[in-house]
Amino acid sequence: MEHPFLREEMALGTAALERLSHSHVAVFGIGGVGSFTVEALARGGVGQLTLVDNDTVGLTNLNRQLCALGSTVGMGKAAVMAQRALDVNPDIDVKCIEGHYEAADRERFFGGYDYVVDAIDLVSCKVDLIMSCMERGIPIVSALGTGNKKDASLLRIADISKTSGCALARVVRRELRQRGVTHHTVVFSPEEPMEPEQLEACLLYTSDAAD
């Protein structure tokens, strides 16, 4: 019988799809990484999502964030992506927490997650979220820095001890090591970020090509 997740079922099997449908994933940070993550999870058949972000869609988000449209500027990012997830799968259970994750208020952000996606920018909050998940036995993956990088084919999933070419990885690795943690799963790119001169050259090339 045809259903929205038939292709996933064909690829992964009925048991795996059933497991996904009963899984609860939390995404912290609904920006350039988090918004696309939410979409992939919803389209992949995950049955329950919690979306955490206190920000609203701005004009500068239009170039890279799935939640950003002319019609959504000024709206909460978590709320926009929650509605989009429901448009994909009306049966999905999606909850928004429109707040800023921080150590002093961490308890209100946790609730029976099977997996957590860390797409937070601020290092102190990022590290606290990682530590909080580890203490609770919740699997977590962290997105690291991709600013001013342009080759998506270089993205890697790795242990943080194996990362290179990422300033954010260096800082997070140091902070975790100070807390006795040496292993953590991350998504990173070893590509060196473009310098301002390179960015300007790219913009000029794009402008010339358009002419």
Regions found by a protein language model. Name each.
Residues 33:
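Hydrophobic/small residue at the entry helix of a nucleotide-binding pocket
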Residues 173-203:
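A charged, well-structured terminal subsegment
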Residues 1-26:
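N-terminal charged helix/coil linker that caps or initiates catalytic domains
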Residues 205-211:
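Conserved small/polar residues in nucleotide/adenosyl-binding loops
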